[in-house]
C-alpha cells in the first residue's frame, strides 16, 4: 500500500464521516516531530464505509484549512478506517524478510475468503515465536478493498500531493501503543463514529486485533430513539 518511502516533512490525514484530522510532521528515522495539527468536521456524504466520495468537495475543505494554517508539505500519508477492512493474525515459517511479502500474497486466500483481485494485502511483523518446536514469524495481516485505497489516491491527486504511504488505522494504533504500555496484558479500544478497533497486548506485543463495524453513532442513535432527543442536545 506504500507508494514512496518519503522522508522529511509530510501531511498525515485521517478521515471518517465525523471529522478530518490533518497533521504536519517531519519524519527522521523512527522519530517524528509534530509541527501543527487541525481537526475539522467532515463534509456530509464524502466518506462512505471507508471510500472517499465527492472527492472535489472533500479536497476543497482540506485545502482551505491547509492554506489557512500554512501547511507546506508535498507528501501525504493516509490512515484508513473502514468497516470493510479485515485483519487476522497468522504464523508463517521463519523466512528472510524479503520473502515474507511473496509468502503472504500466495496464501492470502487462506487468510481471507474473498476475491483477492478486489483487495490489497498489507502485513506487520509482530514477533518471532516457537510453534511445535519450530521458530515462526507472527504477522498481523490486513485486507482492504482496492476501491478504498484507490479513492485515497484520487484525493491525493486532487490535493496536489504525492502519496508517501497508505496505512490502516489498526496498525497506526499498534505502532503508538506498543511504545506506551508495559508487559502486562492490556486491552486497548479505539472507538470512532462508525467503527471500533479492539487490541489485546501481552508482553508489549499485539496478540489480537479486530475491527468492529459499530461505534459512537450506534450508541447516540439508541439514546436519541429511547429519549426522543435531537442530536444537537447530545454531547459526545
Segments and roles (model prediction):
Residues 1-234:
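Hydrophobic/aromatic-enriched cytosolic interaction surfaces used to assemble or bind macromolecules
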Amino acid at each position: 500500500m506504500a507508494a514512496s518511502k518519503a522522508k522529511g516533512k509530510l501531511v498525515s490525514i485521517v478521515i471518517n464521516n465525523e471529522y478530518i484530522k490533518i497533521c504536519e510532521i517531519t519524519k527522521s528515522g523512527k522519530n517524528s516531530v509534530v509541527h501543527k495539527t487541525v481537526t475539522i468536521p467532515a463534509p456530509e456524504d464524502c466518506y462512505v464505509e471507508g471510500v472517499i466520495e465527492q472527492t472535489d468537495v472533500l479536497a476543497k475543505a482540506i485545502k482551505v484549512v491547509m492554506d489557512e494554517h500554512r501547511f507546506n508539505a508535498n507528501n501525504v500519508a493516509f490512515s484508513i478506517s473502514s468497516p470493510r477492512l479485515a485483519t487476522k493474525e497468522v504464523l508463517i515459517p521463519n523466512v528472510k524478510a524479503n520473502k515474507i511479502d511473496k509468502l503472504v500474497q500466495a496464501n492470502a486466500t487462506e487468510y481471507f475468503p474473498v476475491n483477492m483481485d478486489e483487495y490489497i494485502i498489507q502485513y506487520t511483523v509482530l514477533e518471532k515465536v516457537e510453534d511445535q518446536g519450530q521458530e515462526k514469524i507472527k504477522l498481523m495481516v490486513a485486507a482492504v478493498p482496492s476501491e478504498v485505497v484507490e479513492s485515497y489516491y484520487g484525493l491525493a491527486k486532487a490535493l496536489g500531493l504525492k502519496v508517501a504511504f497508505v496505512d490502516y488505522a489498526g496498525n497506526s494504533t499498534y505502532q503508538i501503543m506498543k511504545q506506551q504500555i508495559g508487559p502486562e496484558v492490556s486491552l486497548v479500544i479505539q472507538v470512532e463514529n462508525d467503527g471500533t478497533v479492539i487490541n489485546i497486548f501481552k508482553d508489549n506485543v499485539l496478540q489480537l486485533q479486530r475491527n468492529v463495524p459499530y461505534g459512537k453513532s450506534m450508541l447516540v442513535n439508541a439514546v436519541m430513539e429511547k429519549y426522543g432527543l435531537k442530536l444537537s442536545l447530545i454531547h459526545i
